[in-house]
């Protein structure tokens, strides 16, 4: 058969392991899978929501973009919710508007928005636009809250400031989030909490 009783790694995976333990972990796992497993396990133990874990599995790992995209979607729904129809009889009102998403490809936040707003490519709600020449950053997303009946909508542009968030993390913890994988795990946990 294809199965094996031997394992590639047996031990702890979290932001709290030592650099030596980390090296023992990544040596047999290799590449992106090592970060994927570590970030998902660390996010789970940090108490990240089920929705973020599902999106991270879709995306491949938990990272600043995953958490930033989730934060953007939460803010979008809170401050610019879908407009709903008014019903005079019973039943649940339907959404009158839908979101059209204008992404700036390159950041993981795009995957998060695709997942959380169920806007996968086949649903034609997402368009990636190369806006590099305009000064838009990869952490920026545009949304059109579209009303198909009136053929009008509201343009909403949102982003997260990676430099500021990392500076806040460093000021609070003394840790440079970009110093290595263990530091990035600590940064993600800080963001989760």
Regions found by a protein language model. Give the residues of each.
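Non-transmembrane, aqueous-exposed alpha-helical and coiled segments at domain scale
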Residues: 1-62, 71-193
């Amino acid at each position: 058969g294809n199965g094996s009783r031997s394992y590639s790694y047996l031990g702890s995976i979290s932001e709290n392991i030592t650099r030596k333990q980390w090296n023992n972990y990544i040596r047999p796992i290799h590449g992106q899978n090592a970060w994927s497993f570590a970030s998902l396990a660390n996010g789970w133990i940090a108490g990240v929501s089920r929705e973020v874990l599902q999106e991270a599995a879709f995306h491949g790992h938990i990272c600043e973009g995953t958490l930033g995209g989730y934060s953007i979607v939460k803010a979008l729904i809170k401050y610019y919710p879908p407009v709903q129809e008014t019903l005079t009889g019973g039943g649940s009102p339907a959404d009158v508007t839908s979101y059209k998403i204008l992404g700036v490809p390159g950041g993981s936040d795009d995957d998060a928005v695709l997942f959380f707003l169920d806007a996968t490519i086949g649903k034609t709600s997402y368009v990636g636009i190369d806006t590099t020449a305009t000064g838009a950053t990869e952490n920026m997303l545009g949304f059109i809250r579209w009303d198909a009946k009136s053929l009008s909508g509201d343009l909403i542009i949102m982003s997260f400031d990676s430099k500021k968030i990392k500076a806040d993390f460093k000021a609070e913890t003394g840790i440079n989030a970009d110093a290595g994988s263990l530091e990035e795990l600590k940064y993600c946990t800080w963001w989760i909490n």
